[in-house]
């Protein structure tokens, strides 16, 4: 069924001779999906294609069964927040949301209700009647998010939505995304801050130079490259020397290194599932294992493995 997915089929977009994105094929299910990559990797172009702000040079796009070339249909269920910090002059936060809703043809009473709810959801009730021009950077980011969620959309497309938010508001915003995902909606966000993506996402789309280099659940992507890049596990135990010795007996383990504090072992393996099963047997055999933590199944590590550590830190 494609009517509950965002579909891109061999989509490319060129700006003259400049590549925006090339050959992108994706099938995005409900949930939180993060587009990840440094500036210039194609994240914003991909969002503009999904929302119909730019047309593909080739390929086909469908958003829950609707083509982006049909904006009147598309924006009945799509909310989009760009990263551009521009607002109409003279409007308060409430007026900004209300006018946006009225322009979409909704009755005034419904617009007032939706405006109030959206402003409550982003925590701007006390600032609702202040001019947007007097807002801080973080408050302007939140009022843009309020505009996107005000129509109660089934699909949210958000370009760098956490940029400029303080830690408390960032946490509340992430909780809002997860709540939308739990309701079966799509939340597509872009980010170049990789540690945030681990907190937000069900799935990731890793981009570089206009190409999709990997996509899927982050741990699934990590598992796919474990033969080339063995997975790392941090194992805390009271007998690290014995554990390291036993780990080296496993044919899929390529390294077992004692930690500097001598209270654990860092193990690299080409078969994570087999290693976890082996740990269970070692524990039953008497090795006192206190904890096991994957050391490199996060977005930053995977992106660095696929693209290079220099790109991953941009």
Predicted regions mapped to residue ranges:
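ABC-family P-loop ATPase nucleotide-binding domain
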Residues: 1-12, 309-314
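ABC transporter nucleotide-binding domains
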Residues: 3-6, 13-209, 213-214
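Hydrophobic/anchoring residues in structured secondary elements
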Residues: 13, 255-258, 294
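Active-site-adjacent beta-strand anchor residues
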Residues: 14, 90, 233-236, 268, ...
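Short, well-ordered alpha-helical microsegments
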Residues: 71, 197, 243-244, 275-276, ...
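Conserved protein kinase catalytic domain
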Residues: 75, 119, 222, 303-304
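ABC transporter nucleotide-binding domain
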Residues: 174-269
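C-terminal coupling/interaction segments
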Residues: 270-314
């Amino acid at each position: 069924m494609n009517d509950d997915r965002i579909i891109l089929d061999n989509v490319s977009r060129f700006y003259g001779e400049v590549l925006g994105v090339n050959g992108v094929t994706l099938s995005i299910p409900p949930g939180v999906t993060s587009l990840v990559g440094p500036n210039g990797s194609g994240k914003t172009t991909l969002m503009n294609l999904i929302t119909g702000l730019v047309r593909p040079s080739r390929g086909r796009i469908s958003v829950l069964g609707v083509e982006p070339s049909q904006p009147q249909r598309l924006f009945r269920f799509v909310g989009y927040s760009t990263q551009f910090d521009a607002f109409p002059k003279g409007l308060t936060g409430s007026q900004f949301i209300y006018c946006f809703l009225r322009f979409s043809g909704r009755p005034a009473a419904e617009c007032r209700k939706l405006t109030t709810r959206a402003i409550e959801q982003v925590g701007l009730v006390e600032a609702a009647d202040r001019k947007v021009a007097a807002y801080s950077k973080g408050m302007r980011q939140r009022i843009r998010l309020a505009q996107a969620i005000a129509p109660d959309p089934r699909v949210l497309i958000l370009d760098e939505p956490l940029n400029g938010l303080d830690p408390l508001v960032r946490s509340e915003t992430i909780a809002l995304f997860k709540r939308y995902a739990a309701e079966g909606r799509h939340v597509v966000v872009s980010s170049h801050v990789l540690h945030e993506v681990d907190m937000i996402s069900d799935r990731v789309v890793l981009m570089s130079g206009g190409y999709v280099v990997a996509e899927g659940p982050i741990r699934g992507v990590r598992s796919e490259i474990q033969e080339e890049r063995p997975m790392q596990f941090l194992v805390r135990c009271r007998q690290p020397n014995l554990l390291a010795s036993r780990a080296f007996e496993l044919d899929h383990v390529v390294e077992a290194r004692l930690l500097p504090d001598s209270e654990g072992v860092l193990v690299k393996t080409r078969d994570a599932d087999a290693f976890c099963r082996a740990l269970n047997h070692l524990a039953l055999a008497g090795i006192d294992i206190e904890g096991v933590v994957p050391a490199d199944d996060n977005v930053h590590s995977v992106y660095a493995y696929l693209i290079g550590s220099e790109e991953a830190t941009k």
